[in-house]
Amino acid sequence: GYTLADGLEYIRTGIAAGLNIDAFAPRLSFFWGMGKNYFMEVAKMRAGRVLWAKIIKEFGPKLDKSMALRTHCQTSGWSLTAQDPFNNVGRTCMEAMAAALGHTQSLHTNALDEAIALPTDFSARIARNTQLYIQDETRVCKVVDPWGGSYYVEALTDELIKRAWGHIQEVEKLGGMAKAIETGLPKMRIEEAAARRQARIDSGRENIVGLNYMQLEHEDAIDILEVDNTAVREAQIARLNKLRANRDNEKVQQCLDAITKSVETGEGNLLELAVEAARARASLGEISMAVEKVCGRHKAVIRSISGVYSKESSDTAAIERVRKMTDEFEKREGRRPRIMV
């Protein structure tokens, strides 16, 4: 729901700038993360297409393709485990299959070791080949909406449409996604969902093979990609210094000043000015700072959640023990315990 509400915000902004809906709606695309709840993920993509068409119809498009939802998908990084990581091959495969059957236009498959480090050539090859054999060997991409007509998938799609539309309406009541973000509501809702999920895992209500279920007694270390962060940082600094030494810095400053002036006055095409600055070899950081001089940098509103984890967890005795220990610590030390996360 929030992703589509983002899209709605872009649509309104484009129209307010004088663009015709058919001139830019077909060029919008979305990015979905694919989880391991297979049928849910297929239904999610089907529901997204229905809702996006419903949203765009309100703006009176003349072209059917304006109502088509184009999407890139990436398998979940959240579902990957550092423990017994070869299980991640199966997880990623199922998530990729859900994306394919949900008709993604493009796909990124995560490598098995990405919960630990950047992928090696070995793990990256397995990740790449996973989507290649789904595409080329299974032929599932040759069928349009293969789950259409399934009672379960259709019912799940309908349920997701209703629930996601409720989230969109909640955002609309706040004045749109930009204003909703300022209130911190979407962030809070996402954190609530994450806390509920973590509680189910920690309490054993949700099994994660190799993590809280069917763990290995002894786990052999796997080869991972070692990166010297200090060397990378020094190399990047050297590249920037070389760039600044060989460019026309007067031209760069003129471009950056033009960006700042555009933000101040609201006149001119900011994207065009940023492209011009990049052509003059201004860095991304310099371009961002030229904007930040006027409008500052966004700081998320922090709205803490409470009671979500304990309500979802079945291990209430353990939670009560922690509360008791915390109270005893406070009496003894005069303060609540601090936890570094």
Question: PLM features: residue spans?
Answer:
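Helix-rich catalytic cores of soluble enzyme domains
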Residues: 1-98, 111-128
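Short, hydrophobic beta-strand segments
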Residues: 28-36, 155, 241, 339-341
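Short coil/turn connectors at secondary-structure junctions
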Residues: 25-27, 65-69, 103-105, 266, ...
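Flexible, glycine-rich loop/tail regions that form catalytic "lids" or insertion modules at the edges
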Residues: 131-132, 136-323
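Append "with occasional cross-activation on large, charged helical scaffolds in nucleic-acid assemblies
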Residues: 80-82, 105, 178, 185
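Glycine-rich phosphate/diphosphate-binding loops that line cofactor/substrate pockets in enzymes
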Residues: 22-24, 253, 262-267, 322-338
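Short acidic/histidine-rich active-site segments
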Residues: 103-114, 140-147
